[in-house]
Amino acid sequence: MENVRAHLYIKGKVQGVFFRQSMKEIAVRYGVRGWVRNRSDGRTVEAVLEGPRDAVAKVIEWAKVGPPGARVEEVEVDWEEYKGEFQDFRILPTV
């Protein structure tokens, strides 16, 4: 299975609804590594996902809906070169 890397920007009502924790749980379930964090604009969550293409695709599909309480308006996905730099999936501080 081919490994891929995706850089996501998820916009809408995605902060204050447990989006990051929920994404971490979904990513771990599918064996995806990387990170997720809030952006300081108050309406964007950013994430980098690495893993098998089908697993990353499942996390991206989940991100289009998010957890209960979220209202996702847009998910921008930038495909990047796979680096294999992550050992796990983490929640990073807001930037």
Swiss-Prot record:
Residues 5-93 form the Acylphosphatase-like domain. PROSITE patterns: ACYLPHOSPHATASE_1, ACYLPHOSPHATASE_3. One of its GO terms (molecular function) is acylphosphatase activity. It catalyses: an acyl phosphate + H2O = a carboxylate + phosphate + H(+). The active site is at residues 20, 38. Its EC number is 3.6.1.7. InterPro entries: Acylphosphatase, Acylphosphatase-like_dom, Acylphosphatase-like_dom_sf, Acylphosphatase_CS. Keywords: Hydrolase. It comes from the Archaea. Pfam families: Acylphosphatase. PANTHER family: ACYLPHOSPHATASE. Belongs to the acylphosphatase family. This is Acylphosphatase. It comes from Pyrobaculum islandicum (strain DSM 4184 / JCM 9189 / GEO3).
